[in-house]
UniProtKB/Swiss-Prot annotation:
The modification N6-carboxylysine is found at residue 99. The lineage of its organism: Bacteria, Pseudomonadati, Pseudomonadota, Alphaproteobacteria, Hyphomicrobiales. Keywords: Hydrolase, Metal-binding, Pyrimidine biosynthesis, Zinc. Catalyzes the reversible cyclization of carbamoyl aspartate to dihydroorotate. It catalyses: (S)-dihydroorotate + H2O = N-carbamoyl-L-aspartate + H(+). It comes from Rhizobium rhizogenes (strain K84 / ATCC BAA-868). Pathway: Pyrimidine metabolism; UMP biosynthesis via de novo pathway; (S)-dihydroorotate from bicarbonate: step 3/3. CDD domains: DHOase (cd01294). Zn(2+) 1 binds at residues 13, 15, 99, 247. The keyword Metal-binding applies. This is Dihydroorotase. Substrate binds at residues 15-17, 41, 136, 219, 251, 263. Binds 2 Zn(2+) ions per subunit.
Length: 346
């Protein structure tokens, strides 16, 4: 029986939601992950340090008994964000990053930034105090094809911002294109990228071939196969600029299976099994720890976890529930469309 022991991983991009959904999904993360950067796009969003403090308390209260898990809180950037509040949040140790959502780019992003100039006082303060900016890297202008949103964002928004504020530390979250990978590789400093589990596995065919498959629909949307292969190469390379951010995003089935379904894929429960499969398939099991457990902490200035987990490769396939039940409703679990043989021990 093959075994692989690695430092306990972290998730550098996670949606826990709130209320009954939070209570229903948090255990799938805290079972395997020590820390996670928590997305602030609630309704209403987490825009102040006081909001983040209250949300963190709700997360900790929802943790299953005995689980050790540290939520790393973020603030939702608006055109009215108070730079002093952001700085206080960082000084207190509460705030790990600030999240930029272009208005309308994804779930609950309508209160996001429309004019980046109006957010510059906060961004300048962040650059000064060394607080990272996490970006949803897509433009939302209607004339841009949805499959080109990331590349156009890099050219028209991100690169001008980084030239204007070269000392600002930026995380390109959920990179989905070779353009994004190449841009990160070309940067001399202050740029890194998170990659999701599902974007390593699916391309856009998964959503569209054989019928509309809403449980593979996410934002940024999965791209063509050449982009998926570029993501795989980056993730399995050991390059310290790339790390795991699952973007696990639960929605109840009625909100996915409808005429205008929500974007989001729920992967927290089986991410480590999926990743072990991917890295084994690419002959890179020795790089899994860097991607899931080492590169992220190094980027965010944190120590790696001392605790270890062990992955076991089983002869028989490992089964996960097709759906989970939460107090908010039924959530469909990501199906990688191949059998999984790696399991987390215990």
């Amino acid at each position: 029986m093959q075994k692989l022991t690695i430092r306990r991983p972290d998730d550098w991009h996670l949606h826990l939601r709130d209320g009954a959904m939070l209570e229903g999904v948090i255990g799938d993360t805290s079972r395997h992950f020590a820390r996670a950067i928590i997305m602030p796009n609630l309704v209403p969003p987490v825009v102040t340090t006081a909001d983040a403090t209250a949300y963190r308390e709700r997360i900790l209260k929802a943790l299953p008994a005995g689980d050790r898990f540290q939520p790393l809180m973020t603030l939702y950037l608006t055109e009215h964000t108070n730079p002093d509040d952001v700085e206080e949040g960082k000084k207190s140790g509460l705030i790990t990053a600030v999240k930029l959502y272009p208005a309308g780019a994804t779930t609950n992003s309508h209160g996001g930034v429309r004019n980046l100039d109006k957010a510059m006082p906060t961004l300048e303060r962040m650059a000064k105090i060394g607080l990272p900016l996490c970006v949803h890297g897509e433009v939302t202008t209607p004339e841009v094809d949805i499959f080109d949103r990331e590349a156009v964002f890099i050219e028209t928004v991100l690169d001008p911002l980084r030239q204007r504020l070269p000392e600002l530390k930026v995380t390109m979250e959920h990179v989905t294109t070779s353009d994004g990978i190449d841009y990160i590789k070309s940067a001399k400093a202050n740029l890194a990228g998170s990659i999701t589990t599902h974007h390593l596995i699916i391309n856009r065919n998964a959503i569209l071939v054989g019928g509309i498959r809403p449980h593979y629909y996410c934002l940024p949307v999965a791209k063509r196969e050449s982009h998926r292969l570029a993501l795989r190469a980056a993730a399995t390379s050991g390059d310290s600029r790339f790390f795991l951010g699952t973007d696990s995003a639960p929605h109840v089935d009625p909100l996915k299976e409808c005429a205008c379904g929500c974007a989001g894929i729920y992967t927290s429960i089986n991410t480590m099994s999926c990743l072990a499969h991917v890295f084994e398939q690419d002959g890179a099991l020795d790089k899994l720890e860097a991607f899931a457990s080492l590169n992220g902490p190094a980027w965010y200035g944190l120590a790696p976890n001392e605790e270890r987990i062990t992955l076991i490769r089983r002869v028989e396939s490992v089964t996960f529930p097709e759906k989970i039940e939460t107090g908010a409703g039924t959530v469909t679990v990501f199906d990688p469309m191949f059998p999984l043989h790696w399991d987390v021990e215990g």
